């Protein structure tokens, strides 16, 4: 066996390997012993046909094709060792020719990271104040959640809840037909057609109404764009929303911890402030990591992006599946986006995640931010504080190798971000004026 070509570009090595005739012959013997047990040849019991007869029966070309599985993995591994290549992941092997027996391999190499001057990174964290209007909006939402619905003996208004019979066609074909349809009358509603709610306003229970709506040419659903929907609607029941009275009693009913409405508003303020602070912190850290990536030199094998991309797409598909009502709806949504579309859409995110992971990992090792055993044990003690009688059982779970490794990764990430956060919040660096040359100083003094 000999390596006839070797190239290293970035984080990928490429080699071409030619097997000598002795190795090929030994491999064919191994292939024969494997296949002869599976192939029935007339005149011989299974596994008993001589090699020359067997090779004529299945053809030498077929034997060489099968030989790939028998000798290439081992030969590739030996070639990598002989060339002193340190692979980062499984090589991708491809046959070049079978006679002579030549294969090529693309070998991912470990990523390389050279950090920039991260101690010069500066960023500003946003400060968000919660306005009274923001609290009012949340309180209003809570009121609507606790509202009751009562029958109204009047024409339909915006905000009502209706029980109605709907008959309709779309360009003459059946569209939406329901005997008992519940419908919330909202200005912004676009179902079953834009402006449908407006057409219901002022209707009276028991009196049918007919109207038509033309879908806009730029409608999101192409199969509806430009078409005319003709409706016949009979409202059977009109219900109006009754909001509870906003007072101390409402606050206490909502949560016994609250004795006054002011306490409810204060809790809402605190919760909103926490969420806004979390958003500001996330945005702040995104800026820092982006700055660190831009100032650093990063090279990594494509396999890292592919693995991250697969994970992102899998997560997105799981999220999509959990948000739809039926397998049919899930398949319909999938049909609107090909695997290639998804890869193209999420590839930038995968690349960003890989780069982020690499620079932060390099920073952690450079500044020795990986937690020691004492720090990990202390974190486990915090996590099992409320475990009660199951503390020892919980501790044993956290100390399992895989779980403890994940905890170490979490603590490392936390310490690394805290380290770079502290740097970024320092005052801006002042520009340093260059010192004049000593000769220039002397000349100035002589003048």
From Swiss-Prot:
Keywords assigned: Cell cycle, Cell division, Chaperone, Cytoplasm, Isomerase, Rotamase
Name the Pfam families on file: Trigger_C, Trigger_N
What is one Gene Ontology biological process annotated in the Swiss-Prot or TrEMBL record? chaperone-mediated protein folding
Q: Does the keyword Aminoacyl-tRNA synthetase apply?
A: no
Q: Which GO terms describe its cellular component?
A: cytoplasm
Q: What is a single molecular function from GO for this protein?
A: peptidyl-prolyl cis-trans isomerase activity
Location relative to the cell:
Cytoplasm
> Known EC number(s)?
5.2.1.8
Sequence ranges assigned to domain PPIase FKBP-type in this UniProt record: 159-244
Secretion signal: which residues? none
Record keyword Cell cycle present: yes
Q: Which reaction does it catalyse?
A: [protein]-peptidylproline (omega=180) = [protein]-peptidylproline (omega=0)
UniProt xrefs under PANTHER family: TRIGGER FACTOR CHAPERONE AND PEPTIDYL-PROLYL CIS/TRANS ISOMERASE, TRIGGER FACTOR-LIKE PROTEIN TIG, CHLOROPLASTIC
The UniProt entry's sequence similarity note says: Belongs to the FKBP-type PPIase family. Tig subfamily.
> Function, please?
Involved in protein export. Acts as a chaperone by maintaining the newly synthesized protein in an open conformation. Functions as a peptidyl-prolyl cis-trans isomerase.
HAMAP family (UniProt xref)? Trigger_factor_Tig (MF_00303)
- Record note on domains: Consists of 3 domains; the N-terminus binds the ribosome, the middle domain has PPIase activity, while the C-terminus has intrinsic chaperone activity on its own.
Protein name as it appears in the record = Trigger factor
Organism from which the protein derives: Dehalococcoides mccartyi (strain CBDB1)
| Record gene name | tig
């Amino acid at each position: 066996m000999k390596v006839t070509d070797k190239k290293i570009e970035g984080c990928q090595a490429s080699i071409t390997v030619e097997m000598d005739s002795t190795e090929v012959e030994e491999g064919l013997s191994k292939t024969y012993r494997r296949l002869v047990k599976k192939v029935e040849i007339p005149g011989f019991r299974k596994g008993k046909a001589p090699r020359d007869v067997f090779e004529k029966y299945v053809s030498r070309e077929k034997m060489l094709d099968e030989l790939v599985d028998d000798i290439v993995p081992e030969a590739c591994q030996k070639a990598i060792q002989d060339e002193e290549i340190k692979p980062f992941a499984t090589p991708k092997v491809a046959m070049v020719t079978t006679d002579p027996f030549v294969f090529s391999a693309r070998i991912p190499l470990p990523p390389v990271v050279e950090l920039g001057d991260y101690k010069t990174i500066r960023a500003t964290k946003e400060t968000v104040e919660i306005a009274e209007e923001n609290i009012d909006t949340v309180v209003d939402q809570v009121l609507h959640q606790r509202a009751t619905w009562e029958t109204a003996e009047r024409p339909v208004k915006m905000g009502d809840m209706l029980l109605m019979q709907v008959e309709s066609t779309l360009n003459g074909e059946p569209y939406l037909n329901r005997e008992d349809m519940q419908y919330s009358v909202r200005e912004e509603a676009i179902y079953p057609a834009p402006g449908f709610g407006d057409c219901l306003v002022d209707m009276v229970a028991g009196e049918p109404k007919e109207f038509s709506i033309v879908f806009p040419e730029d409608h999101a659903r192409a199969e509806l764009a430009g078409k005319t929907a003709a409706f016949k609607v009979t409202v059977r029941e009109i219900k109006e929303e009754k909001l509870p009275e906003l007072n101390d009693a409402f606050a206490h009913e909502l949560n016994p911890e609250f004795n006054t409405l002011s306490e409810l508003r204060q809790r809402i303020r605190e919760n909103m402030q926490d969420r806004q602070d979390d958003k500001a912190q996330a945005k702040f850290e995104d800026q820092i990591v982006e700055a660190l990536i831009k100032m650093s030199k990063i090279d990594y094998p494509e396999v890292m992006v592919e693995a991250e991309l697969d994970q992102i797409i899998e997560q997105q598909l799981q999220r999509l599946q959990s948000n739809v009502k039926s397998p049919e709806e899930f398949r319909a949504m999938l049909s609107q986006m090909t695997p290639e579309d998804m890869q193209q859409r999420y590839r930038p995110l995968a690349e960003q995640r890989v780069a982020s992971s690499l620079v932060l990992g390099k920073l952690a090792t450079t500044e020795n931010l990986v937690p020691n055993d004492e720090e990990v044990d202390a974190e486990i003690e915090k996590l099992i504080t409320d475990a009660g009688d199951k503390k020892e059982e919980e501790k044993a779970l956290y100390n399992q190798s895989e779980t403890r490794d994940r905890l170490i990764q979490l603590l490392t990430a936390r310490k690394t971000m805290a380290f770079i956060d502290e740097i970024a919040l320092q005052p801006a660096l002042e520009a340093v004026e260059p010192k004049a040359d000593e000769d220039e100083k002397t000349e100035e003094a002589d003048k």
